């Protein structure tokens, strides 16, 4: 059926900020969809609150609204734009939930807006647990025995009939939020209450647990003509019971017989037809390992994390084709862009194995509960491609950048057998490594199958890897053994360690023996047809399929998996850099391993290599391609950390030189440079031993800021208030030695200011200055940032401009530069300089219209800023106020303290823009998920050091009509200042205490600041966690509270500004 001509204007809903369960895969899907619709000639209107994405770039749609994703804001945009249709299936759960709500409120009908792609009734049938179960029963398709419940009593009644264990699945939530497996009454109470709270329709499905079954997924496409195909089928190595986003997944499935494969394939196609889904859809099934009994777990009627993985695993662009299906095109009318010869109706075929391993944030959150279940905890994922499962899996392991390069964990050998068994039985994020350790201790495949319920096929493969380790150790220097090790996916780093030689020596040995990988093409058709895509992976075979052209090429290193501290902002910069390289007339080559992102879409670069970002894997590509240089500025710390090794092997690093990168990152050299340039910095020194650290800290004076050198996202950074805490930090957070020194700085309290700049060595362009709302000490990625600055004098701005220019020139920066300053007692100090792209680059680029990553790339390639018409210094400020606010995923991570500090904790960001600071703040806070009711109660629990400031805040809350709740001591202190406060019991006291108030929804805001030092924080920790579990905004910085107050004050009439009219009777005029 040809595309529709009765519609012209289409509104696309984005997925908003990156949170656990909804990451960069929707930026990729949304970007593909917008471009596909524009390609077909439609006018595209995009709404998304996330400034860090490619999707919100002006080139992606005809009009882009970076506004909060709430029904209220969308209603205004729909009334203003009057689109003919809306496409909600590319914005994740957020997009679906909004479409359903806009329909229920009657907005779509009022404005005559049609829903494209999958119909709302189908979305509701797939998402509403009750409707879905009813449909499955009508189709005679098996679902686990289950019950829809709306209260704890209903849950207890159901369990008394079928017994434990049961799985709880809340309706309309994302990434399994609020769900879990319950094995007893206590767990049932906790999980059901939480699940009902988090479900927007207060409904949960309780089902008999089928944990231990194989979990199989089918990614299916269907068009309006009822053509339906399977794009990819995938198998979770972890059995049912662990969220698929937290499972290690392989494609194609490895353990299904043809009969099983066809059985589940037919079921998946039957379901997509029964639901009437038009576009992409993900079907999750459970299969009994010992029979043909299967159950349907769920259907996602939208583009999902799995479809991004399936797209990258097969090369088949699901989101692009789903968008075209939505406007009426059918699969047999569209060409498959990979081959350019076959139609999209051909099912892809794979002649390789793909492995996906999730990337969890537990390196950031040491205290988090690492146990995996039905609620997702990973922030991102990596994918690797190999000819065998072993090769693909080992490549994925070293892509994780989790300090592992083989199936080995540093301290796994030290734990007892008992603990090892426990960690295999109760799945955690490191189970794969513990399985390998168990084999080294003599456990058998049967033992481990019994402990983990993982299929014996996968366990045999792992056993084979561990067995080969012995052969490798026994045959040092044997090139036949070396070749087999490389075919299995063993890394040079591991082999060189076992053979007691340098990695570079092993590399030379391999070269002499002719043991080098070849590159194979991902072509969707197992080499049956010729293919046009330049999408490659390495493997140790004979024939190389990657043809090197005569054109000069430039290689860009991507940023790997999404994790806290290194998010989608770096992918944004990578993509812009690739576009700039192509514009400059060079061939752009990208190396990356993240299946969720735009940068790994094969249509972005001239050549895409899907490989681990390690020195070995990158060098293989360089050996073949011989690029004129490598760009490391845009891939975050991942790429910067490779610069040294690459340079040592004779590779040219483009942009800022290695010596100058080192001057910015190495503490002593940096201090020296600042001294020469006359730029002040806080008093600080470098310690290489614990004793030295203690004496430095006492010389400088507490509190001090301590951090390891060369890190991103403030990893292991802390503010320390006395010696005892310093010793605890030294012992637990860092491994201090002369190679890994620790930096100790005087902790300055003051306003933090951030600047991004582009320099070509002669001219320095500063697009803008951003002022942070939270004072120094809160990581810049977790602060609310405002542009243009609202409280800085012209003198201070001038000084920041001078220092930035001096630093850029003094450090010989070529390309991008990010500087953080602190304004303390009228003086500007430099906190740190990052000679690379930063997480504020997309935000500033969008506001100022200065395409920073694109410009920086052209500078790196030898052009000058003056040629583009830029003059030196701070550029004129834009009209309006722009606010960037962080977004956290604390609800998904139990036992994590939400207090803001120098270590980054946010997973994403949103932007609010308007004519005044208050309005822009309001939009940013609403977009980040904070409710701002203009009446209610605020619960105040502040540390003694914050009492005075807390008092001022309480006064202002009281003035706008808020009730103040506080514990006895604080309430007394407030009463002395004539502020009425209701007394609430401390934790553990009888009567309504702090936790009861939060649980019962009696407080709209909780303001809680840490007591000095970390230890007495346990009560504070419980208050903060209780707030998160109950969805109450908890503010751990008084600056954030002040910002919310500004918004509330601008929205409400203050009581003291509404005096009653004087009714003095005597003066009344008598008639």
From Swiss-Prot:
Mg(2+) 1 binds at residues 284, 298. Belongs to the CarB family. This is Carbamoyl phosphate synthase pyrimidine-specific large chain. Residues 1-401 are annotated as: Carboxyphosphate synthetic domain. Small subunit of the glutamine-dependent carbamoyl phosphate synthetase (CPSase). CPSase catalyzes the formation of carbamoyl phosphate from the ammonia moiety of glutamine, carbonate, and phosphate donated by ATP, constituting the first step of the biosynthetic pathway leading to pyrimidine nucleotides. Its EC number is 6.3.4.16, 6.3.5.5. It is an enzyme of class 6 (ligase).
